[in-house]
Amino acid sequence: MEKILAINAGSSTLKWQLFEMPSETVIAKGMIDRLGLSDSVFTAKYGDNQKFKEVQDVTTHEMAATLLLTRLKELGIVSHLDEITGVGHRVVGGGEAFSDSMVINPVALDEINRLAEYAPLHNPTQAYYIKIFTALLPGVPQVAVFDTSFYSTLAPENYLYSIPQEYYQKYGARKYGAHGTSHRYVAHRAAEILETPLESQKMITLHLGSGASITAVQDGHAVDTSMGFTPLAGITMGTRSGDIDASLVAFLAKKLEITMPEMIDILNQKSGLLGISELSPDMRDLEETADTRPQSALALSIFVNRVVKYVGSYVALMNGIDTLVFTAGSGENGSELRADICKQLACFGVKLDEEKNNVRSQERIISADDSKVKVLIVPTNEELMIARDVMRLK
């Protein structure tokens, strides 16, 4: 038995899970929230439903990593740190340099830092944690698991933009996608549930959370995805606009007398469901107020509309569909949302079982027995995918 630590680091949070492998048992999990502030919160769940929480100053990433390893020992989750035989790190941007997860060496770490211009909010922090854990756990393999590597199989006609090709050749201006680790996990898990090889299925996976993306999977690999050069592209999201005419971006920046970075910030932080509803980016708030607020109902309709358009285009791209998979917050818990989406996909043979659909975040098949397309709920588990990659590569 081996213990693998999965790290999902952001600028102000450090999420973690410790797995016993190869049984894939979660030994402990938790997070450090509000990093960089005087009231940072460390939480852990472990053992027989034991919980631990403390508030203290965690002002640097070094302090966060040290605190995590210290608490793992003090809480008796591990007796010695040398029980940890591998650490896996989520890294958002792998560009074209990384087509698979990788055991990190100094050259690879430099490349992750070089790719920071493609994921400026994530790569620098995630690369720094790799460096920190390498120092704190000497000799323990550090594996980077890239959000983008699942999309290394896209064909040029699906990842290139219709712009002068020198911009792609010089600057890497192309679709990279995001949420790849989530889509990869749910695609493989859905195939296991159906007891049908992924390689023989035409599958569409819907990651519908505050950030939302759709991926088409054929012959066992991704063939297209809704997010683009950045996670701003694709369907309407909680606060992100999704696809938008580039000329409108310049037009609004001029009208508002703001800079382009300020305009992009509006598209990332103040648009999507929040922008349309003028109330909330949370699907639950919109569903609760849809009967009394036309803007809430409109936001929900636009979201469903964008999802259906992408699914329809991917069905055409693959010349059919066998399996539709819902995951992430709204995808796992939104029975009404799933019903609204599937109702508009009836032309493809999608039919839900109403009773099976009325569950929250439980892994199951929810399509009717006579549905031509299998529809599933598969709660995502990026950390487990990370742990599996560590075991495969270390």
Q: Would you name each region that the model predicts?
A:
Residues 152-253:
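Glycine-rich phosphate-binding loop of actin/hexokinase-like ATP-binding domains
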Residues 265, 272-276, 283-317:
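Adenine-nucleotide phosphate-binding core of ATP-dependent small-molecule kinases
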Residues 9-10, 89-93, 208, 325-333:
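Glycine-rich beta-strand-to-loop/alpha-helix junction loops that act as flexible
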